[in-house]
Amino acid sequence: MPLRPSKEPYRNNVAAFFENLLPDNRQILERIQRRFGVPSVNAFDLLSQIGRDCVGALQLLPEDQEPPNVKQITSKKLSSEQVAELLSQTVGNPLAGGMDSDEPLRISLAGAQEKTALLLRNGSWRLPTGSTPTTHILKLPLGVNPQGIDLSSSVENEWLCSEIVKGYGLPVAGCTIETFGEFKVLVVERFDRRLSSDRKWYMRLPQEDFCQACGIPPALKYENDGGPGILRIMEMLIGSEQAEQDRRQFMRAQVIFWLLAAIDGHAKNFSIFLLPGGSYRLTPCYDVLSAYPVMGHGRGKLAPEKIRMAMAVHGKNRHYRWKEIQARHWIETARRCGIAEMRSVIEEVITTTPQVIRHAQSQIPKGFPDLIADSVFDGLNAAAKQLRNDLAKP
């Protein structure tokens, strides 16, 4: 949202832009409201208190506050035990300052799960102060959702999916599995932060997700609910400064997400970097989670025939159901987006799959849950085989 020369205020879609900076989980929003004593869960009320470290380059402060100098690094060193204490407070109080601090951690992270963020500096974890941004997000396990689906191994699941996506050659946010006390977390390196060339301060890099780019509120992030789908995002990427590369990358990501049964690839899980002069380009992938470990029938399982992708592919009709999608639907969807070589993209992904699996298997640490690894690798193999058979049909 560039500043208008006339200083005329934005209306309508501006609320959606700011709503997308916040967690899209009502319970988390209500806990933030209670923690800071704001009158509502309205985005502007919440961001007036927690907007000091938003996704991208934004810093939002109360009207009477001046931002401290951004070109310096100020922080408090944390022990492993203190990080564990901070994590223990995150579930009950997602933005607690923790320890002996009277100052809450005023960060805003989008998404639906419990998480916090810290600064990693010279190998030590630190609580940023002043205008110093966080550099890493610490994501806790999702646990059991209201439908009884057990996502307690989401940390391992997301780590493995990231390794697989990286193996296919797609850029993806770097992540590791770390343990602090009783808490296992996925530590994700923020790609909207960069150390300055003189190594004296951390830069915030402007970015926005595709809900923000389209003026869509987070409640409508799925295409079936009115959010952007493949066709709309591919149209927007025509304007990317590296349009051919980004459009091919996005379509490859869609196929790989289907292979992984990564069914939550909605518009908030794809973003663009905002560059000087009004340019933009696609960011790395992030938040990739496979449904294979919870597929099945009965309580606490997702029936494969009912699973839906976040974005539709096209044939004579739109297809969301994971089980119904075939290679021809990807080819037709790409054709509508002006990409003629989708068949070769699919063939490349299929051919690469065995090598990707072998590499990911070699990276698995000791104690990694067999259910996650076996179900994801078996599912990936089966889906690649299906695509191969689809391409062989006349």
Over which residues does each language-model region extend?
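Phosphate/dinucleotide-binding and metal-coordinating scaffold of catalytic cores
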Residues: M1-P394
